[in-house]
Amino acid sequence: GTYGFDEYGIMLPWWTQVASVSNADKSNPTSDIPTRFYAGYDGGSLQRNVWLWMYPSDNLIQDDFNDGEYSWWRTDQNGEVYQNKIKKVNGRYYAFDGLGRMQTGFVLFDTRSTFVAQYDMDAWSSEDFIEGNIYGIEKADLYFFSPDELNDGSMQTGKELEIELEDGVYTFGFKSDGVAYGNRNRLKKVNDSYYINGLRLEADEEYGYGVVREDDDSYRVVNANGKTVTGKKKV
């Protein structure tokens, strides 16, 4: 097998030395060289093609090290940790930030090669999605990964995902490639329903209908399922 050693020839357990971590983007600190993991319990052998439930070394990210903050990490055939990418593993897709930590919940990526931000489901309200009041949402693609970090964490897709936000449970939609309908603050019509930043726009329950702005001069009326109201309707 492959083993890691420091400059004194002493076998390295756990993480290899990281030359430096770029903090130019505070929301996504990134290791500037590939990170590898050597098992401290297996004679120091390089861990290839495996999931690791670990906290990072202090030179990767000090806060997580100090807190003993565990995350999932995934290595490739060379033992290098996946970083800054959405990657298919055993038929499912997972998100990894610039250090290699798996991300769950709402995740923003600039294409699939630069992690931008992660948000828990209850971090924002429905109004925040409608108004686009979320850091990075205009310039990055929105995905949703199962919040069950311990047992799943994979990309979720479909037109009717029930997600509990700060102000209640709402319906979201994500394309087969994982990108949200109505991505990047652009209203999107899908099967006669409207979505913005993944959120399906629905009527006010009290009135049974709502108004959706398509552009500066155009509005549509939608019912409680987000469908366009056509013809005559008693209100």
Task: For every predicted segment, state its role.
Residues 1-235:
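Extracellular adhesion/carbohydrate-binding repeat motifs centered on closely spaced tryptophans
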